[in-house]
């Protein structure tokens, strides 16, 4: 039997997070040495799901203020960032959640190797999802930030959301994440990522 092909997603240029590209909304990026500006890609899509022990709420985020309010009101907040080539959105996430420049660069680097790293008050987990595309095995980057009462996922734009099953479980109350906290949500997202390997093995 012929072996299946394996390939990764296409390589992107790393998003420039320098302050020269600061948006009109006033989100200042972290300082860099002599960064060269690159054109931004399509705007990233930010989906927020917040929950407690009894209910949950979902929305598409348009402003930083929405993230700040959600963090104050809900015990567990998950922000899924779909799109790695939108430096304005990346800077906004860094400002709201106090994510450093090096960690942000890791989050939006498509070829980042899987790893776990602690950045002060946050844990960064770089991983890869696996799927079939025809006869080829395709791996897509996903980066998770675990912080105090929140999880952030950065991932490529994909036709199929690898975490939709997690959303459904939270919507229908089939998890105890609202009681158990953001670390339980992070563990569930990693479980789903790893489970995706079994059909390929």
Give residue ranges: language-model regions.
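Peripheral, non-transmembrane regulatory/ligand-interaction domains of membrane transport proteins
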Residues: 1-201
């Amino acid at each position: 039997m012929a072996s299946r092909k394996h390939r990764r997603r296409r390589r992107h240029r790393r998003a420039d997070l320098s302050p020269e590209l600061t948006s009109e909304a006033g989100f200042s990026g972290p300082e860099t040495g002599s960064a060269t500006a690159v054109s931004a890609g399509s705007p990233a899509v930010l989906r927020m799901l917040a929950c407690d022990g009894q209910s949950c709420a979902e929305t598409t985020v348009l402003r930083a203020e929405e993230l700040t309010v959600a963090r104050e009101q809900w015990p567990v907040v998950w922000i899924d960032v779909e799109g790695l080539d939108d430096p304005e959105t990346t800077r906004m996430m860094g400002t709201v959640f106090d994510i450093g420049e090096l960690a942000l660069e890791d989050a939006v680097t498509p070829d980042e190797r899987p790893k776990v790293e602690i950045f002060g008050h946050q844990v960064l987990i770089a991983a890869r999802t696996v799927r079939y595309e025809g006869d080829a095995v395709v791996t897509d980057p996903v980066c998770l930030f675990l912080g105090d009462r929140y999880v952030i996922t950065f991932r490529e734009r994909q036709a199929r959301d690898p975490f939709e099953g997690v959303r459904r479980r939270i919507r229908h109350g089939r998890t105890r994440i609202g009681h158990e906290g953001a670390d339980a949500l992070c563990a569930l997202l990693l479980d789903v990522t790893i489970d995706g390997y079994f059909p390929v093995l």
